[in-house]
């Protein structure tokens, strides 16, 4: 009996770990315009989407795979994602949910808040500068970049 119980527990652990983190269905979209981070956030919201939240290496890889399928992919591409430390310097949060960023994929020596005003995160693939789908903090209003929107299933409480 004990052996069957242990086998069942191991089976449950294997099934759970093979699915990784339980994440809702997500759809990514990169508009054909470039914008600063604020306008990118507004644009995604106008589509009933949000700037993408990357909560794990699997998420980072999924976003990279998606970008590679689009016309925006080059050997020198950067995209706004949905986190900033605008509210509290050094504490990055996913702006759509207010959740603190716990997974990161910073490029070496980032975030550096260069010039004292780098508060928004970009995802970059620039091999010549050692960016391999890594993150950089940048000025929110200073650069117009492509950006990645996502739609997610609502995990909110349904009314009675």
Curated annotation (Swiss-Prot):
Female salivary gland (at protein level). Residues 1-20 form the signal peptide. Keywords: Disulfide bond, Glycoprotein, Host-virus interaction, Lectin, Secreted, Signal. It is found in: Secreted. Transmembrane segments: none annotated. GO terms for molecular function: carbohydrate binding. Antisera against the protein added to infectious blood meal blocks the interaction between mosGCTL-1 and envelope protein E of West Nile virus and reduces West Nile virus infection after feeding. This is C-type lectin mosGCTL-1. It comes from Aedes aegypti.
């Amino acid at each position: 009996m004990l052996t069957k119980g242990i086998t069942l527990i191991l089976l449950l652990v294997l099934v759970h770990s093979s699915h990784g983190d339980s994440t809702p269905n997500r759809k990514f979209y990169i508009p054909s315009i470039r914008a600063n981070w604020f306008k990118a956030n507004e644009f995604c919201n106008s589509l009933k989407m949000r700037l993408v939240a990357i909560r794990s290496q699997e998420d980072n890889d999924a976003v990279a795979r998606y970008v590679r399928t689009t016309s925006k992919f080059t050997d020198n591409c950067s995209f706004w994602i949905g986190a900033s430390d605008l509210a509290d310097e050094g504490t990055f949060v996913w702006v759509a949910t207010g959740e603190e960023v716990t997974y990161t994929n910073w490029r070496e020596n980032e975030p550096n808040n260069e010039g004292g005003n780098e508060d928004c995160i970009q995802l970059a693939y620039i091999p010549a500068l050692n960016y391999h789908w890594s993150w950089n903090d940048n000025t929110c209003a200073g650069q117009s970049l492509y950006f990645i929107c996502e739609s997610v299933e609502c995990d909110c409480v349904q009314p009675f």
